[in-house]
A protein has these predicted regions:
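Non-catalytic peripheral regions of nucleotide-handling enzymes
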Residues: 1-5
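A general structural-boundary detector
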Residues: 6, 51, 113-117
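Short, compositionally biased low-complexity segments
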Residues: 6-27, 94-110
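Acyl-donor binding region in acyl/amide transferases
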Residues: 9, 14-18, 23-66, 70-72, ...
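A conserved beta-strand-loop-helix scaffold within acyl/acetyltransferase catalytic domains
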Residues: 72-84, 89-186
Length: 186
């Protein structure tokens, strides 16, 4: 009999914790790592061809996003709450998207905002904006006190191919940053 345990990811379930979305509810998540251990029989090949291992991770990520998983660094997770199904993973087919009147108004109001797609390289300017955001919105969250080296690691050492999208106002001041996964179907 062949040991298949290294061929498939292992899934785990978190304990329950207060739901961040619905007061009085609890949440639970199912998760797995995107960086599984290399296959025992293929270790030399993976070390010789690391991009093929990244390809495996990207295929796993793609497959899991199709069934509602989200990514946070090297972990993919989705809600797995016993008594609630309110969290919905939303995928919008871009070819079918039709802009609403309110979205047109918002776009017109913000027509002075520009964006630029960049490689996944962390900068101090991005980090300062992240700190400002955390201090104003997530001061009790898990990212409070993140260091620049931790931010740099999050941005630059991803198991998935990523890009940075920077948003700037008319004075070229950085006002938004999106660390974005590059995916075959997106």
């Amino acid at each position: 009999m062949t040991d298949q345990s290294t061929h498939f990811p292992k899934f785990y379930v978190t304990g329950t914790s207060p739901c961040p979305y619905i007061e009085g509810n609890t949440e639970q998540k199912i998760f797995t790592e995107l960086s599984p251990q290399p296959l025992a029989y293929d270790k030399a090949a993976i070390l010789e061809h690391p991009n093929q291992n990244r390809s495996r991770e990207e295929e796993l990520h793609l497959s899991l996003t199709l069934v509602g998983f989200r990514r946070s660094q090297e972990i993919v997770y989705r809600p797995a709450c016993d008594h609630c199904q309110e969290c919905k993973s939303v995928r919008i087919p871009s070819k079918l998207f039709k802009i609403s009147n309110s979205q047109k108004r918002i776009s017109k109001k913000n027509n002075d905002i520009s964006f630029e797609i960049k490689p996944n390289t962390a900068t101090q300017e991005q980090f300062k904006l992240l700190e400002k955001y955390i201090n104003s919105r997530h001061f009790e969250g898990g990212m409070m006190g993140i260091s620049f080296s931790e931010y740099k690691d999050m941005v630059e050492n991803s198991p998935i191919s990523t890009i940075i999208i920077e948003y700037r106002d008319r004075d070229k001041k950085l006002i938004g940053v999106a660390l974005t996964d590059k995916m075959k179907n997106a």
